[in-house]
Amino acid sequence: MDTTTTATQMLHLPSLPVLLSFLLFLLMLIRYWKNSNGQGKQPPGPKPLPILGNLHQLADGQPHHVMTKLCRKYGPVMKLKLGQLDAVIISSPEAAKEVLKTNEIKFAQRPEVYAVEIMSYDHSSIVFAPYGDYWREMRKISVLELLSNKRVQSFRSIREDEVWGLVEFISSNQGRPINLSEKIFTMTNDIIARAAFGRKNSDQHNFTVLLEEIMKIGAGFAIADLYPSLTFLRPLTGVKPALMRIQKKMDKILEDIVAEHKLKRKAAANNNVKLEEEDLVDTLLNYAEATNKNEFHLTIDQVKAVTLDIFSAGSETSATSMEWAMSELLKNPRVMKKAQEEVRQACKGKSKIQEADIQKLDYLKLVIKETFRLHAPGPFTPREAREKCEIRGYTIPAKAKILINLHAIGRDPTVWKDPECFRPERFEGSSTDFKGNHFELIPFGGGRRICPGISFATANIELGLAQLMYHFDWKLANGERLEDLDMSENFGMTARRKENLQVIATTRIPFEK
């Protein structure tokens, strides 16, 4: 090789520092181009760690509490890396409105949750079904048939009967400690069982225990949900075998319920008589047994999925809200006294309250609103971005997991004066409701995926609280002081009390058995 030529070529090559500087500049230019043209303006958030993302920060407490603290620092649209997932936390009414109303089609999808995939018969439930034709049909059936206002009113006698059973139990145990949490959950489960299945079920206790296990696992923060690509981890964490065990037991109970209904329907058809009363399972079986090819048709697995949906969502929402309302009333005796005086004056002379009496109880309704503000039944309303879009000027990538933090919105000091104070009077003269129209108060979500069971849950809560306020005076059991009442939550698909509410009741208004 000609050494002169080689030396001349080397003189024309850039030096190593110059080359590295150029490459670094090019890399920064590419990254800037991606941010400005590809990803757009990203929501702020704490810096994630490799592999973990921001999961280490959630270890400091309940996820919705930690996220509330973080949003006060980073803003109402905050980005978190949860394992492999891109999550955007929404913590203001304005941002929630953009998700649930302005861009509701773009956020009409529910994020995939591993527990739900197994338990809901391949996403056949109303709550978690993918946005599409099946979900639209089921939504229509829910709103017009299963949980319409007319149908909810048809369950009035069931509600009154089961609430009265609770009143009788408390009266027969007055002066003794009562696990009110347990009794409230039993009451709401009995209401749902009779509405959905036609009667209380012998397997109901087992059904409820299995539901509680699902609620703990199905919050979306399991390893399988945070690292969806690492499928080999699922058996190792123990979640998959636990879910399969629960699903097998739950399916057997649901299969028996469906089989019993089929026998009842067949007997009625053979005798050429119409069923006296159709419960919710009967309504679903009408679609499973449809013979017209043009009619919407359900499989038996879909019937079971929707039945499970109704039972779990209905009982948990009503019971959790009643439990928190009673907790706040005990913690705030001024409010309890005012609620008791209202119902005792409005229903004076009556031995029991009828559902028609509820319309007179304006202050009780304010108590329920205030309970929903501080204690939404579920801490988050989850969504998934179906496509790339913008929220409050920030670019949200397709497939991003959206968590609307109801805990943060209910305690936002820019929206609510003294947000930690339980003060129902804040809603006096206000048009704010909880039916998805006012995004500062959305315990049931909003938009087209709003919970269809609002009327059903509200009716249970109103009648239950009215009877408890009317007939009894209350105090905490075991000599516990009001200021020492533990108001901690358990985190799951719902946010129940961490400790059961233990109380002592004294009959104030006598009644006829």
UniProtKB/Swiss-Prot annotation:
For the keyword Transmembrane helix, the answer is yes
Q: Which residues form the signal peptide?
A: none
Q: GO cellular component terms? A: membrane
The Gene Ontology terms for molecular function here are: heme binding; iron ion binding; monooxygenase activity; oxidoreductase activity, acting on paired donors, with incorporation or reduction of molecular oxygen
Q: Which UniProt keywords apply?
A: Heme, Iron, Membrane, Metal-binding, Monooxygenase, Oxidoreductase, Transmembrane, Transmembrane helix
* Superkingdom of source: Eukaryota
Q: What is its EC number?
A: 1.14.14.-
Summed up, the tissue specificity of this protein is:
Accumulates in mature fruits and in juice vesicles.
A Pfam family matched in the record: p450
Q: Which CDD domains match?
A: CYP71-like
Its primary localisation, in coarse terms, equals: membrane
Keyword Lyase carried by entry: no
Q: How does it sit in the membrane?
A: Single-pass membrane protein
Q: Which InterPro entries match?
A: Cyt_P450 (IPR001128), Cyt_P450_CS (IPR017972), Cyt_P450_E_grp-I (IPR002401), Cyt_P450_sf (IPR036396)
Q: Where's it found, cell-wise?
A: Membrane
The residue ranges crossing the membrane are 10-30
User: What PANTHER family does the database record attribute to this sequence?
Assistant: CYTOCHROME P450 71D11-LIKE, CYTOCHROME P450 FAMILY 71 PROTEIN
Q: What does this protein do?
A: Monooxygenase involved in the biosynthesis of limonoids triterpene natural products such as limonin, a compound with insecticidal activity responsible for the bitter taste in citrus. Catalyzes the conversion of dihydroniloticin to the protolimonoid melianol.
Q: Record's family?
A: Belongs to the cytochrome P450 family.
Report what the protein is called. Melianol synthase CYP71BQ4
